[in-house]
């Protein structure tokens, strides 16, 4: 699978992910780009799960963003609704983290749209719980930037989870 983590701190939101693509117990690729910018660079999105499925979902989500003038929550709810009810989409196996300058969300294939706890940290994928734990500890006990927390959290997840590597793609808003 993978690890995707998002941290929002001091007016900045950062989404990062590793680059490992696995097929069963074999690493197929080590430098996949699982975090992207959508909607003219105003929305960050990262995926965990099937790569082909995720690209389909990225395209659908970008269409929803266009349809709803970039309104993140409305677009996420509409995507989740379609994902849950459409026969073909229902078979897609992936999860998304999406974020803009105001909010961050997880979108799941069972129709859930999840907002973060008060700490504004989200994580998904096989290494998600490791990254989430690390990020929470770093937010509570350091003054590190959101980007530094994402980097360190992904490194910890990559050291523990066999389906996560340490080749990272990290995007942030506002751009630094």
Swiss-Prot record:
Its EC number is 3.4.25.2. It catalyses: ATP-dependent cleavage of peptide bonds with broad specificity. PROSITE patterns: PROTEASOME_BETA_2. It is an enzyme of class 3 (hydrolase). The active site is at residue 2. The keyword Hydrolase applies. Keywords: Allosteric enzyme, Cytoplasm, Hydrolase, Metal-binding, Protease, Sodium, Threonine protease. InterPro entries: ATP-dep_Prtase_HsIV_su (IPR022281), Ntn_hydrolases_N (IPR029055), Proteasome_sua/b (IPR001353), Proteasome_suB-type (IPR023333). GO terms for molecular function: metal ion binding; threonine-type endopeptidase activity. Coiled coil: none annotated. One of its GO terms (cellular component) is proteasome core complex. Allosterically activated by HslU binding. Na(+) binds at residues 158, 161, 164. Protease subunit of a proteasome-like degradation complex believed to be a general protein degrading machinery. PANTHER family: ATP-DEPENDENT PROTEASE SUBUNIT HSLV (PTHR32194:SF0), METALLOPROTEASE TLDD (PTHR32194). Belongs to the peptidase T1B family. HslV subfamily. This is ATP-dependent protease subunit HslV. It comes from Pasteurella multocida (strain Pm70).
């Amino acid at each position: 699978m993978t690890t995707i983590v998002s941290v929002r701190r001091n007016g900045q939101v950062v989404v990062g992910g590793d680059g490992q693509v696995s097929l069963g117990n074999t690493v197929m690729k080590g430098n996949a780009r699982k975090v992207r910018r959508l909607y003219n660079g105003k929305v960050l999105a990262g995926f965990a799960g099937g790569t082909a499925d995720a690209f389909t979902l990225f395209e659908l989500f970008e269409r929803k963003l266009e349809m709803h003038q970039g309104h993140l929550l409305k677009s996420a709810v509409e995507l989740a609704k379609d994902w849950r009810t459409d026969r073909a989409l229902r078979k897609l196996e992936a999860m998304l983290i999406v974020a803009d300058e105001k909010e961050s969300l997880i979108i799941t294939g069972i129709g859930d749209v999840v907002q973060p706890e008060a700490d504004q940290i989200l994580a998904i994928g096989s290494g998600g719980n490791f990254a989430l734990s690390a990020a929470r500890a770093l937010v509570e006990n350091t003054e590190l930037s959101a980007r530094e927390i994402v980097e360190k959290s992904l490194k910890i997840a990559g050291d523990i989870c066999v389906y996560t590597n340490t080749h990272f793609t990290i995007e942030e808003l506002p751009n630094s």
